[in-house]
Design a protein with these regions (language model features):
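Conserved acidic carboxylate
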Residues: 6-10, 77
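Two-component/phosphorelay signaling modules centered on CheY-like receiver
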Residues: 10-30
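Acidic, metal-coordinating helix/loop segments flanking the phosphotransfer/catalytic sites
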Residues: 31-49
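Short amphipathic alpha-helix used as the core "switch/output" element in two-component signaling
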Residues: 40, 56-70
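A short, hydrophobic beta-strand element within the central beta-sheet of small alpha/beta folds
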Residues: 70-83
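As written
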Residues: 85-94
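The C-terminal output helix
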Residues: 108-118
Length: 118
């Protein structure tokens, strides 16, 4: 599986990448603090899921909407989860602190054809 992690919080990027590698050994992870770099990656390579945080989310979703990207986006949320109508294309909200169980639960919503590749 290929994931993209987008966050202005470098420490959070590292923690999330370590957890994803634990849940999906051998997965490929692209980390970035810049939504534009992530969009460039999405346009050249299929990414199974994007993880982002509330600080980066508005910019990322604006870019995704502009590119009509269908990639699943998971919002990492420090506070109360926003209502569904505010999360747009977000598949799931993962509340802090992020744990392996929360990632596994969120990724169960990934389409079956992707899960079969794992």
């Amino acid at each position: 599986m290929i994931f993209a992690n987008v966050s202005v919080d470098r420490e959070q990027l590292t923690i999330l990448s370590q957890l994803l590698l634990t849940v999906f050994p051998g997965c490929v992870i692209h980390q970035s603090c810049d939504p534009l770099r992530t969009m460039a990656r999405l346009s050249t390579q299929k990414v199974d899921a994007v993880f982002t945080d509330a600080d980066t989310y508005p910019d990322l979703m604006q870019l995704l909407d502009r590119h009509d990207a269908k990639t699943s986006v998971y919002l990492l949320c420090r506070h109360d989860a926003p209502p569904p109508e505010e999360t747009g294309g977000v598949r799931s909200v993962i509340m802090y602190p992020i744990t392996r169980q929360k990632i596994q639960a969120a990724l169960q919503t990934v389409p079956r054809e992707i899960m079969e590749v794992i």
